[in-house]
From Swiss-Prot:
Keyword annotations from UniProtKB, A to Z: Cell cycle, Cell division, Cyclin, Cytoplasm, Isopeptide bond, Membrane, Nucleus, Phosphoprotein, Repressor, Transcription, Transcription regulation, Ubl conjugation
Family the entry assigns: Belongs to the cyclin family. Cyclin D subfamily.
Species of provenance: Mus musculus
Keyword hit for Phosphoprotein: yes
Spans annotated as Disordered: 262-283
GO aspect biological process, one term: re-entry into mitotic cell cycle
Protein name stated in the entry: G1/S-specific cyclin-D1
């Protein structure tokens, strides 16, 4: 009987140990100051871009999210890539035929910043059905980093989530669930152009509160618990509680519309029948339970 050598080792990603010094108030204050320096323009569709419209951004953002999910990228890669894309479009007019090339390039650079083993140019070209060549992607990479003045370490909502969770008196198992759902909300917000005007800290805080409310975590009176959390996080990020609450409601509305859209894609006939019932019952007044979402 022949002896076979089998490699049973599983490739694990090397990570640094959690450092509590990185979660202190001094670091958070520095992050809140820095986040505005890498913010895109809110009005670039009207002032800069001639061919690209918000619906095109939505399409390429959804494609980028699917690529990141299929490649099991780190959670920070997609929001960071969208930050690069919005900042570039805030500075440089772009033909719509080159928007997918820009999206692939943004993922390429963000992956280098956040991944141990980054995405390759060849792999990203495959995801475009080889409509772009690796050489084009590398040329676009040089243009991107020059337009962004090599300021690539932008703040994303993910950078703030851990700070918020460390300050909240929740059980560790609850924090893990909140973190998972908040990260999903952050990715969802990055696909929607309405959230460009919100700083990353507010998107992160709104996602955490929306996750808590949807999961019914906290005290037995969940509404009171979320109300207190909203006021607490608004003090942490130094914003008006009403602004944070509005951001949270936007996130819940976006989730609801995304679920409705997904349902229509699965079963259009059933959706039409259910739409009439929903209008009569007025179900839009209650936020969607995030436990119904397959994350």
């Amino acid at each position: 009987m022949e002896h076979q050598l089998l490699c049973c080792e599983v490739e694990t990603i090397r990570r640094a140990y959690p450092d509590t010094n990185l979660l202190n108030d001094r670091v958070l204050r520095a992050m809140l100051k820095t986040e505005e320096t890498c913010a895109p323009s809110v009005s670039y569709f009207k002032c800069v871009q001639k061919e690209i419209v918000p619906s095109m951004r939505k399409i390429v953002a959804t494609w980028m999210l699917e690529v990141c999910e299929e490649q099991k990228c780190e959670e920070e890669v997609f929001p960071l890539a969208m930050n690069y894309l919005d900042r570039f479009l805030s500075l440089e007019p772009l033909k719509k035929s080159r928007l997918q090339l820009l999206g692939a390039t943004c993922m390429f650079v963000a992956s280098k910043m956040k991944e141990t083993i980054p995405l390759t140019a060849e792999k990203l070209c495959i995801y475009t059905d080889n409509s772009i060549r690796p050489e084009e992607l590398l040329q676009m990479e040089l243009l991107l980093v020059n337009k962004l003045k090599w300021n690539l370490a932008a703040m994303t909502p993910h950078d703030f989530i851990e700070h918020f969770l460390s300050k909240m008196p929740e059980a560790d198992e609850n924090k893990q669930t909140i973190r998972k759902h908040a990260q999903t909300f952050v990715a969802l917000c990055a696909t929607d152009v309405k959230f460009i005007s919100n700083p990353p800290s507010m998107v992160a805080a709104g996602s955490v509160v929306a996750a808590m409310q949807g999961l019914n975590l906290g005290s037995p009176n969940n509404f009171l618990s979320c109300y207190r959390t909203t006021h607490f996080l608004s003090r942490v990020i130094k914003c008006d509680p009403d602004c944070l609450r509005a951001c949270q409601e936007q996130i819940e509305a976006l989730l609801e519309s995304s679920l409705r859209q997904a349902q229509q894609n699965v079963d259009p006939k059933a959706t039409e029948e259910e739409g009439e019932v929903e209008e009569e019952a007025g179900l839009a007044c209650t936020p969607t339970d995030v436990r119904d979402v397959d994350i």
